[in-house]
Amino acid sequence: MLLVVQTALELGFLYAPVALALFLSFRVLDIADLTTDGCFVLGAAVSVTLTAAGHPLLAVPAAMLAGACAGFITAFLQTRLSVPSILAGIVTNTGLYTINLMAMGWRSNESLLGSDTVFTLLRSTGLGGDWYELVLAAAVTLLCAGLLALFLGTRLGLSIRATGDNPDMVRASSLDPTFTVTVGLCLSNALTALSGAMVGQYQKTVDINSGTGIVVIGLACLIIGETMLGRRTVYKGILAALVGSVVYRFIYAVVFYTKVVPVECLKLLTAVIVALAIAAPGLRRWAAFQKQKHSRKEAA
């Protein structure tokens, strides 16, 4: 059972940057960025390829840089070519399939068996003991969350937040929303690629289809965290993304361990939960309207 808890914590922290990325794009910028699935695989592909070449430490920032480039393309399509945000993400995501194959040497998967990773390098130092993978995953994710919180409190970070709230006000303040959207999407996709890079080295493998459904899982983590902690402030939203990711992985582990729901159906269940959570405000308004309508009929 302890192994189940340890694995759930490790995966929770490893996938948390995806939830942070979606918090930045979906909540802060109010943009539905669908580059996530392809960008996750891009990060893993770059990381695994460089790690196999003997550069596990260089692999992580290189993967983040590749993710930022993917975010830049999405932002360019959206801001310069006036492509709707959803379509811009779909176009970039489609193109990334070929880029990811190219990064893996035109193979659909790649393995790191026999290669050193950032995790094995930490194990060789003796730090963390048997929990070395959790220590590294938690340290990287918490560092990213802290830096993101600090960044969103800077002048540029406040401009990005303002762009999501009211782009017209940003223009009236002599700020360029094109620049703030571009920076925000580059940063969010860099976080997604970071998650892919760490997961690739953690699992010692990458597959071209390993990113399928990542955007839905990230949204589920974000929504679970917001349900538990709320999202009244940016800092609470960041914390909610972290907590939600860990809780989601615990739910996944319990389902996998107890077999309450077939594991094959878990992504379907995740999609239903996300759909209901997103539709919740509209459903509440509909329920209130029906209740008011029923009360008027009784009064008449």
Segments (PLM) and residue ranges:
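Alpha-helical transmembrane segments within multi-pass membrane transporters and channels
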Residues: L22, H55-T94, I99, T141-A145, ...
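Transmembrane helix-bundle core of multi-pass membrane transporters
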Residues: S85, N93-G153, V183, C265, ...
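Loop-to-transmembrane alpha-helix initiation sites
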Residues: L11, I86-L87, S108, E133-A137, ...
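Cytosolic-side transmembrane-helix boundaries in multi-pass membrane proteins
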Residues: D165-A172, D176-F179, R232, L239, ...
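Helix-loop-helix "hairpin" substructures at the membrane interface of multi-pass membrane proteins
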Residues: A70, D130-V215
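Single transmembrane alpha-helix segments in multi-pass membrane proteins
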Residues: L3-H55, F76-L81, I223-R231, V272
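Transmembrane alpha-helical segments in multi-pass inner-membrane proteins
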Residues: T192, G196-K267
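Short loop segments and helix-boundary regions at transmembrane helix junctions
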Residues: R27-A32, F72-T117, L122-R123, R155, ...
